């Protein structure tokens, strides 16, 4: 099957070549607002492959890979591996594409970026999907992520890689079988030049976590206020160690336009390919021109 997206690049303000997948949609679908999909800390554009294909049936979908991930350049200065810099990179892409109103799907770190972008320029987002993240994240989940990111593990075969993921993240996906772990491995890893299978990101993205104060969970309640009244779908894994039920309740109070869907027996983060989640996302977009 031919690819339904184009590999494109833009240049960051500090000269990095950054990659994004452009799904043009039917006939360019100019009449409908585009969708911007932003991935999590260690992820890349492949995370949204199935969702982007589905959404591109009716509208354009843009899936950037943040610096240090996938086909995007690695940064020479690891201090630039921060949500503020990622937001600046994405804002430059949006400006170059002439996009001033859009829908956002943000997973984990991508959701944090969504709130920062909303706070900096309110009123641009027609609808938002937040995947297992909120203005306040649990310290337990942050500690778990800090413990595995940047470890530089490698594997001799895809099956070994899948089993490695199952060992590390089995608590978040207790019902996954080997095929599903293989699928996750192929979304998050690549074959390196020496033939070993490695994670598809710069291990240096972990360095900012090691600096004093940087590992503290962010508090973005003020930024979240910029999304008050914006139609929102909050997806939460029932087993999530990053997004608590209490935070979900507070988010609903602050944004009455938010609907929540909880994915049973899944932790951080749902794939967004779950049938109920996919249906909810499509329903949200049905209300957006």
Segments from the language model and where they lie:
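Alpha/beta-hydrolase fold catalytic core
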Residues: 1-35, 57-59, 99-100, 276, ...
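Conserved hydrolase catalytic core segment
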Residues: 100-139
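Catalytic histidine-centered segment of alpha/beta-hydrolase-like enzymes
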Residues: 266-275
């Amino acid at each position: 099957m031919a690819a339904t997206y184009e590999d494109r690049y833009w240049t960051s303000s500090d000269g990095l070549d950054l990659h994004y997948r452009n799904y043009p949609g039917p006939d360019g679908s100019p009449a409908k607002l585009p969708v911007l999909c932003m991935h999590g800390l260690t992820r890349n554009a492949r995370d949204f492959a199935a969702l982007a294909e589905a959404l591109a049936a009716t509208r354009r979908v843009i899936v950037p890979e943040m610096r240090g991930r996938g086909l995007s350049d690695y940064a020479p200065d690891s201090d630039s591996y921060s949500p503020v810099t990622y937001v600046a990179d994405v804002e430059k892409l949006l400006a170059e594409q002439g996009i001033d109103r859009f829908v956002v799907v943000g997973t984990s770190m991508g959701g944090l970026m969504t709130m920062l972008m909303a706070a900096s320029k309110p009123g641009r987002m027609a609808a938002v999907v937040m995947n297992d993240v909120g203005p306040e994240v649990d310290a337990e989940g942050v500690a778990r992520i800090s413990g595995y990111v940047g470890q530089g593990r490698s594997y001799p075969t895809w099956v070994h890689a899948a089993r490695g993921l199952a060992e590390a993240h089995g608590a978040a996906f207790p019902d996954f079988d080997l095929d599903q772990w293989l699928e996750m491995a192929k979304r998050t890893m690549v074959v390196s030049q020496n033939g070993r299978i490695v994670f598809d990101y710069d291990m240096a993205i972990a360095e900012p976590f090691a600096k004093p104060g940087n590992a503290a969970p962010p508090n973005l309640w003020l930024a979240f206020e910029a999304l008050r009244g914006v139609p929102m779908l909050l997806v939460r894994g029932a087993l999530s160690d990053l997004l608590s039920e209490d935070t979900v309740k507070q988010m609903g109070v602050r944004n009455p336009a938010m609907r929540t869907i909880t994915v049973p027996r899944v932790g951080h983060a749902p794939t967004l390919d779950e049938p109920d989640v996919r249906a909810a996302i499509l329903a949200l977009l049905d209300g957006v021109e």
